[in-house]
């Protein structure tokens, strides 16, 4: 069994936001088409980060990855 020590993007995002003393993410999940889910996060600067996936978990993960990329770009 392979137990990866890497953190998932949702955990990384939460830890980075806590470190920067920013509000924790709130995910808004929708299912515009059967079998496809969308998740969005709105940042403190009112920027939207969208994720799509075949499950809510996948969509939230992609939204978190997009927000992380934005935050890392600012460093």
Residue ranges and their predicted role:
Residues 1-75:
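Double-stranded RNA-binding/processing signature
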């Amino acid at each position: 069994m392979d137990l990866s020590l890497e953190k998932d993007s949702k955990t990384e995002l939460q830890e980075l936001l806590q470190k920067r003393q920013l509000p924790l993410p709130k995910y808004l999940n929708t299912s515009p088409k059967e079998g496809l889910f969308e998740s969005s996060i709105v940042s403190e600067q009112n920027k939207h980060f969208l994720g799509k996936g075949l499950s809510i978990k996948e969509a939230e993960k992609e939204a978190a990855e997009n927000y992380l990329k934005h935050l890392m770009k600012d460093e």
